[in-house]
Design a protein with these regions (language model features):
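N-terminal active-site segment of His-dependent metallophosphoesterases
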Residues: 1-62
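Active-site-proximal beta-strand elements of phosphoester/diester hydrolases
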Residues: 15-23, 143-150, 212-213
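Residue-level marker for buried hydrophobic side chains located in beta-strands
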Residues: 18, 45-47, 72-73, 145, ...
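Active-site environment of divalent metal-dependent phosphoester hydrolases
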Residues: 23-27, 53-56, 79-82, 152-154, ...
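His/acidic metal-ligating clusters that form di-metal
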Residues: 116-203
Length: 258
């Protein structure tokens, strides 16, 4: 059975950052890392998933998982890819292409992977080892839980026990959008903070002990007439210690991009 929860020890030599959804935007990610003076020899980057689709460099973003300083949970966009690799007939390819896959897959995944077998091999490896959840230890003993869309339970240890055996719980970690509910707040016991992406927010938000960090890579190149609140979509990377300083956020209506 694959290890669905990856536990990562504290970084004793450098800094740790978390980053929101990347969606194939490699160059904006590199610009953000340069802005925070990221040092790949010492620092580490933890991703909430959705590395691929929509942007022009999905391959380069997917291959970041080969770097020793890069850690990522799977997002719903990776899971669509993994589902196709496992059972092509079980995936609506036209929907996938409309959902942002066309930017790198062209007319479809079958032809693309025939031309790029090395990317297919990397994706097949990730399908077997990419976790649903990362548990990150800090030097002071605090712990941060990272998953793509949310943490759907009230107790951290419940997830540890149930995740391998409950497909519905696995789906919830990839697809649920509770932050879109007015007034949503959840405090997860047994973990100090949780960090998520999936739903675009105009700025990093805290609900209970959950941090939502997807500030809009999905919006790059899109007209923003749907909302005047997100006038500056970006990829956001935050040092983990700073997450604890983010105040609780009143519950606005996040944007309908994921």
């Amino acid at each position: 059975m694959m290890n669905m929860i990856q536990r990562v020890a504290a970084n004793r030599h450098g800094r740790d950052f978390v980053v929101g959804d990347i969606h194939g935007w490699y160059e904006p990610l590199m610009a953000e890392l340069e802005a925070v003076c990221f040092d790949p020899a010492l620092d580490r980057l933890f991703s909430v998933g959705d590395l691929i689709n929509r942007g022009p460099d999905s391959e380069r973003c997917l291959l970041l998982t080969e770097e020793p300083w890069f850690f990522a949970v799977r997002g719903n966009h990776e899971q669509i890819l993994f589902n196709w690799l496992r059972q092509p007939d079980g995936v609506d390819v036209e929907m996938w292409l409309r959902y942002g896959g066309k930017t790198w897959l062209g007319t479809g995944p079958e032809h693309y992977f025939l031309r790029h077998p090395q990317v297919r091999r990397q994706a097949e490896t990730l399908a077997e080892r990419m976790p649903w959840v990362i548990e990150l230890e800090l030097e002071d003993g605090r712990r941060i839980g990272i998953s793509h869309s949310t943490f759907p339970l009230d107790e951290w240890e419940d997830l540890v026990l149930r995740l391998p055996f409950e497909p519905a719980l696995q789906e919830a970690l990839l697809w649920e959008r509770p932050i879109k509910q007015p007034g949503f707040v959840r405090h997860v016991d047994g973990i100090d903070l949780t960090v998520h992406g999936h739903v675009v927010v105009p700025r990093v938000e805290r609900r209970g002990n959950g941090i939502y960090i997807d500030t809009g890579a999905a919006l790059f190149g899109k007209p923003l007439k749907r909302s005047s609140r997100t006038h500056n979509p970006r990829i956001t990377a935050i040092e983990v210690g700073e997450l604890f300083l983010i105040p609780a956020t009143p519950a606005p209506s996040p944007l309908a991009f994921d």
